[in-house]
Amino acid sequence: MKRDFVDLWDLSPKEAWEIVKKTLKVKKGEEELGKPLSGKTIALLFTKPSTRTRVSFEVGIYQLGGNSLFFQEKELQVSRGEDVRDTARTLSKYVDGVIVRNHSHTWLKEFANFASVPVINALTNMSHPCQILSDVFTLYEHYGEELKNLKVAYVGDGNNVCNTLMVGAGMFGLKLFVATPEGYEPNSYYYKKALEFSKENGGSVELTNNPVESVKDADVVYTDVWVSMGEENKNIEAFLPYQVNEKLLSFAKSSVKVMHCLPAKKGQEITEEVFEKNADFIFTQAENRLHTQKTLMEFLFREPQA
């Protein structure tokens, strides 16, 4: 039976932990993934621009022995009105898996439901599970098992990254404090899912509109762009108190690490000074997309055991 990765909860917490821990062994050279994609072709179907997601997946597919085909939506008949169900069923006859980056989460779920091959969410307006799985790996690589004792603060827009980070906190047992402007809170369904997972795994997720309250004594401060692709009409003024700058970080621990999923709009959600001070950690975070996604693909495309 095929496995999709449309939302983070398509993995059980146990499976997610296994991927994170295996990724560390592979990155250290203690374990090899081999060539699980040998003889396989993976399609990348993107409607949104991408640097890290596209390159990390294409390189990862190659390193796992597979071939990749990249398509923008405008190159396919779906852009002229073909039923998403028909596109999914057609591509499933040609390729062994599809990685989708699409504005609509509903569209992606419909595509996955009708595809007969594994489908991976490479970002929608609602969810970014590959990013958060990789981010948890970055924390695990740096802090080890202590990551469960960390205070992680997310400051900014309650967007797709924030939605999935909440779920990730619940699944991995992290303590997450989310601060967003009023009216820009994260999705209520993802918050509900995060609370459900938190009860099972010992984590916590708290929401506030006060950025100082969120970052107070934080070990990690995470931010993302205030204006995502296709959302250019936001009230930037409402976000100004949520900028990750030296003043805001003065309320966090002196050893605080800053995370950003990139691309960064320096001077908006984060200052140039803070970004450059934390550049090593931020670009390790970016690098880890490759390592984590390779382990994820090995898991999803693994041949079933007899």
Swiss-Prot record:
It catalyses: carbamoyl phosphate + L-ornithine = L-citrulline + phosphate + H(+). The keyword Coiled coil does not apply. GO terms for cellular component: cytoplasm. Pathway: Amino-acid biosynthesis; L-arginine biosynthesis; L-arginine from L-ornithine and carbamoyl phosphate: step 1/3. Its main location: cytoplasm. Coiled coil: none annotated. One of its GO terms (molecular function) is ornithine carbamoyltransferase activity. Its EC number is 2.1.3.3. PROSITE patterns: CARBAMOYLTRANSFERASE. Carbamoyl phosphate binds at residues 50-53, 77, 101, 128-131, 261-262, 289. L-ornithine binds at residues 160, 224, 228-229. It is found in: Cytoplasm. Keywords: Amino-acid biosynthesis, Arginine biosynthesis, Cytoplasm, Transferase. It is an enzyme of class 2 (transferase). GO terms for biological process: arginine biosynthetic process via ornithine; citrulline biosynthetic process; L-arginine biosynthetic process. NCBIfam families: orni_carb_tr, PRK00779.1. Belongs to the aspartate/ornithine carbamoyltransferase superfamily. OTCase family. HAMAP family: OTCase. Reversibly catalyzes the transfer of the carbamoyl group from carbamoyl phosphate (CP) to the N(epsilon) atom of ornithine (ORN) to produce L-citrulline. This is Ornithine carbamoyltransferase. It comes from Aquifex aeolicus (strain VF5). The gene is argF.
